[in-house]
Amino acid sequence: MLLASAPFTAMAQGQAGIKAENLDKSVRPADDFFTFATGGWQKLNPLPGAFSRFGSFDQLQENNNKRINTILTDLLKKQGKEGTTERKLGDFYKLAMDSVRRNKEGVSPVKPLLNEMENAKSLSDLRALQLKYASFGYGVPMGYSFEADEKNAKMNILLIYQDGLSLGQKEYYLDNDKATTDIRNAFRQFIANMFRLYGFSDAQAEAKRDAVMRYETMLALISKSRTELRDVEANYNKMTLAEFKEKYPNIPLEQLANAEGIKSEYIQTMVVCQPAFLAGVDKLTSTETAEELRARMEWNAILASANYLSDDVRAEYFNFFSKTMRGTKEDYPRWKRATQQVEKQMGEALGRIYCERYFPATSKKRMEDLIKNLEVSLAERIKAQDWMSEATKKAALEKLSTFYVKVGYPNKWKDLSQLTIDPSKSYYENVQTCQKFWAEDAIKEKAGKPVDKDKWLMTPQTVNAYYNPTTNEICFPAGILQYPFFDPKADDAFNYGAIGVVIGHEMTHGFDDQGRHYDKDGNMTDWWTEEDGKNFEARTGKYADFFSAIKVLPDLNANGKLTLGENLADHGGLEVAFNAFEKTPEAKKGKVIMGFTPEQRFFIAYAGVWANNITEAEIRSRVKSDPHSLGEWRVNGALPHINAWYKAFDVKEGDKLFIPENERLKLW
């Protein structure tokens, strides 16, 4: 995956490609290329109050939000025929926009559920409620879903994985630096405040808060870190249902699955991703009291409903998760939150209309041509590596040649005829209906069935891209095929430096520290010779060390192990895209535009993709959780290892970004 506003039409009418106002020519490119290429953009785009990070991605997403909101507003005005997808989109958007109704209802839509939990006095009563609401997982500290079997990638299998941490990462519960401790203390207060807002007394709120904190802290102790979760082989442990019951007798997996509509025959074999975590959960379950389980179930229900109730509840949620954790100053406006929620529940349906209105066929064709050129370039680079044997090269080239390429939008669209949106019910109740629909749909489509390679993992309007190892596919949604990633009016230097590197980035994921463990059919298998595998690990280990040495704040280093895959993909994307660009007629002509050679424009376009402003709190949050390096270091950390960049900008010894050639990292 590649991550984590003026309308594009207006941009396309003006100057194409690189924009002079986005640069800061007072900075030498050899000393700080990020500021040289994006300093002007940073000054022109100060951090908006509703963002903790605002960059080129976000600017484009803002434009998409406005487009999607226009679609929804039009649908609301037209009041389509009852039962049509268009009517459902409009009705759901209206519910999301109706804050007057939500404020009048307060927390009443979720009170029947909380009352059920509060009135369940015994463990058996509470566990019966867990089965009743199995689709929502209240109080269940593990996740499970049907996904491709990584060692038989054509078939889906039940995956069971660690879950249950409200803060996402274990470090928030266990680290003791001041920034983390402050967040943890604020989290404790937030839990109690939320229980009070939902009608519990001070004494109840504090007792339930303590129960939640105790349990989640114990979960943190047995959870793997984000870095440990990157080890694909260590996180694949196949077992039978009988073995699961023997190992984890206190976890009622079969009952939960059956309650959700999953037949036992479909879970006779499964993959347990983190066995030690489940062993810990099994032990915790054996000693848990009714009071503790009730508090956790209620907390899960509260957290899951907070964005769909009255403004005071949403404000409390925002104040902790956005303001405290990320440094955001103000919430998104109501229209934007409403638009995002419609996207979350019916995104593909919106995407179909989006593509009809905004995605030209010419963009799809040009993108497909670029991809073909970069596939040729990557093949050449694989063949040229002196550290790989011919056998491994052959397997790598076979994998590359079988990439399944997706551009723009899916070949088939999801049928939503069975999804019901009922305007007489609350916004929260309709969200629950949607969530249950998608949970049941996933079971119907995946349980006991082959993997559907035509299914997209992102909506067409998403500003991102991805590589999926189990289907060996690269996907570029329509949403990202716009400025500053792609400009049909710009020269090749711009498009190869921007979207070209994105394409190369996703291709390289097929051969990064995770992707290299999967063959051309998507199966996890070791297709490398032993020596080649060792060579790969030795080379990539240097990338991890290099990025871990970067200080992102005076008291905080980057995590090169967590970001390894993305850093490898950035490096590979740059090498592959530049190699392909050099073959273009425009590159060979060497025409100077705006005072820059084609090679210089290539690298400026690349850096422009990562232009951003960011809060300190967001930096700290991303270093803990994000497998991508910060934007500044995707430029200043990546380019000093690209020989062509030195030549393009005459970077020499003594310049701040200079690295001796024998110390530059190289893989592809």
Which residue stretches match the model-derived regions?
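Short secondary-structure subsegments characteristic of cysteine-rich extracellular domains
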Residues: A50-L72, A205-I222, N495-V501, E599-F603
